[in-house]
Amino acid sequence: ENGKEVVNPNAFDGIDNDLDGLIGQEALVRTLKNALKSGRLAHAFLLTGIRGVGKTSTARIIARTLNDIPDSQGVDEHMDVVEMDAASNTGVDNVREIIEAAKYKPLSAPFKIYIIDEVHMLSKGAFNALLKTLEEPPEHVKFIFATTEIRKVPVTILSRCQRFDLRRVDTEVLSEHFKNIASKENVQIE
């Protein structure tokens, strides 16, 4: 319904702690928390921003939250989360592998999540192959795309994603965050 899937909102009770760790990205956190509470999640997210702003880390936090992955397990170790660097895997065959695997339900989590970093590096053929799956996504699949160059992502892909523009976190906000962590850990900092 309208590109958003309706899920049981109670399935996500108490698992948004990782989202709270996304300091300086209040709009993204608020939007995702509201989507989780209402049970209406987009099937594809697009994270944009300059290099080093935290797009890949944010993608992993979103994946951890959606699939309720415990802190003791790395997101990259989870069998229902697949991460692909489009800079190294630009071709249509790489995307077709994902599309083929996406047909199968997740093994141990609510969703199969595909994180595609540097998505703007995909070839035209790869984008075209991906488009059909984005138009009619399996209910158990979520895509998280990250890019530094939004202009290179076709509008047909952009229009099927919920977009978040990540901003560099202000130094004062970071400083306050580190002070809070140090205080909780009983560590003194200058």
Give the residues covered by each predicted segment.
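Short, intrinsically disordered, charge-balanced linker/junction segments flanking boundaries
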Residues: 182-190
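P-loop/Walker A NTP-binding region and its immediately flanking N-terminal helices
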Residues: 1-163, 169-183
